[in-house]
């Protein structure tokens, strides 16, 4: 089966939430989108609240990924523990609330793995290596049983995003980068 995936990032502020609420379901239907991953870490400009996460689900997001603004709205911590459809970067160092990857049911019984990782270049966060963390997750039996594995790599530098894409080539079905809120000027 051909799986049509839509990756949306980063949803910024009320304007981003509003356009998603008005257009995402229509787009999913028009383009026969089966699974949608939305980076929602800027839904409240910096960070996301549980109410905003629920709004993204209502708009049509299947999974929400986060990034360097994960902890800007402290009320999200409990939500991250309870809701398996919202992911924070898997490579945050130490014990932090939530999960960095998930396995979800797709159409026709497909198992879809989604991994959320964050780059370390020019991002001020306490992070383990995203490359080592990717390896650890991809060695897990439950992830290996997935039909499709998708990776949202939240990073500043296009060089780091490109390195991750090459590193995961042949091991996952898709890698995309989120975070930079403007188009790149380096031909990427």
Pin down the residues of each PLM region.
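Acidic, metal/ion-coordinating pockets
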Residues: 1-188
